[in-house]
Amino acid sequence: MVVGVHRPTQLVIDRQALHDNIQAEVTRLASGCELFMVVKANGYGHGAVQVAQVAKEAGATGFCVAILDEALELRAAGFNEPILVLGVTEPEDAPLMAQQHISATVAATDWLVAADAYLALAQPTAPLQVHLGLDTGMGRIGFKTTTELTTAVSYLATHATLNFEGIFTHFATADSPDETYFKQQVAKWQTLTAALKERPRYVHVSNSATSLWHAACNDNMVRFGVAGYGLNPSGTAIPAPYALKPALSLTSQLVHSKQVVAGESVGYGATYTAQQTEWVGTVPIGYADGYERRLQGFHVLVDGQACEIIGRVCMDQLMIRLPHDYARGTRVTLIGRDGDHVITLQEMADYCQTIHYELACGFTSRLPRVYRH
């Protein structure tokens, strides 16, 4: 997709905020515990390569991604740190992963058998590093029984093309005040890992929520994701142990303003009709940029004042009700601070009845990312 550099709409990423969030968590970790920064989905919409660089400077010793292509992007950008692909990859890509020193998540022994066959043919110079995923209650991927786990571990021990580098699970409710299900998963994890005769290099269960609120579970590595971007994993349910600094802002400018009179309508479907004479401004951003159509009725900030989005959000533009006329080029803040007022991703997510993760990841590549500080 084309990046809209000739349009006054941009995501602004605060590198210092990223650094402060990540460094704050690094300093909380017990001695010997490493932080891998999760930069999947283009760094939660913030830019994977740029976030990885800041994370490295802040003390991260490795990275986690969702798919192999994201790992290859980091390697192409010059990162030599360990990279773990959290999703299941194709066995035929095992030689490429071994060659690029990218670690694979494995959720079934038949994957190991298939990957071993490809590795035996390709004969890479190093074995494929493997992290065994355990399904302790997420219901997504992973080994569920002790028998399944020990079978996989035995296979790894007898095949030189594969190296047992790590083992992990993922908690479904670590961001909830109710710890009942979380404790059930912890117990299942402990039961499964008790079957191991030897621990691998990395043992990790902690996502952002677990590391923030259940640090005793951290073991020797945490997968630090959404909190590194300054977003509370629980939304507003649980206070963070330190101040998280949101790193993402979204700004634009007015490209047009006009006066409408009572009875005139605005936008597709004529869903908004003026009840009196008022000023309407047009902002060049829409749902093609990831600004949700369901944000009709929400607000943006103009000159520090909240201005309602009127009519439906269009593909490329939206309209707002202004208190008075403003000049073309006047700044519009869609996420972030303007004067004494601030719009947060959490506030937007609440309005859309979703989570801030979804909104952050949904901003498309048509929006340029500008990095500051």
UniProtKB/Swiss-Prot annotation:
This protein's pathway: Amino-acid biosynthesis; D-alanine biosynthesis; D-alanine from L-alanine: step 1/1
Modified residues (N6-(pyridoxal phosphate)lysine): K40
Residue positions binding substrate: R140, M315
Top EC group: isomerase
Cofactor (UniProt): pyridoxal 5'-phosphate
Gene3D superfamilies in alphabetical order: Alanine racemase, Lyase, Ornithine Decarboxylase, Chain A, domain 1
GO biological process: D-alanine biosynthetic process; peptidoglycan biosynthetic process
Keyword Isomerase listed: yes
Molecular function GO labels: alanine racemase activity; pyridoxal phosphate binding
Catalytic activity: L-alanine = D-alanine
Function: Catalyzes the interconversion of L-alanine and D-alanine. May also act on other amino acids.
PANTHER family found in the cross-reference section: ALANINE RACEMASE (PTHR30511), ALANINE RACEMASE, CATABOLIC-RELATED (PTHR30511:SF0)
HAMAP family in UniProt: Ala_racemase
Protein name: Alanine racemase
Species of the source: Levilactobacillus brevis (strain ATCC 367 / BCRC 12310 / CIP 105137 / JCM 1170 / LMG 11437 / NCIMB 947 / NCTC 947) (Lactobacillus brevis)
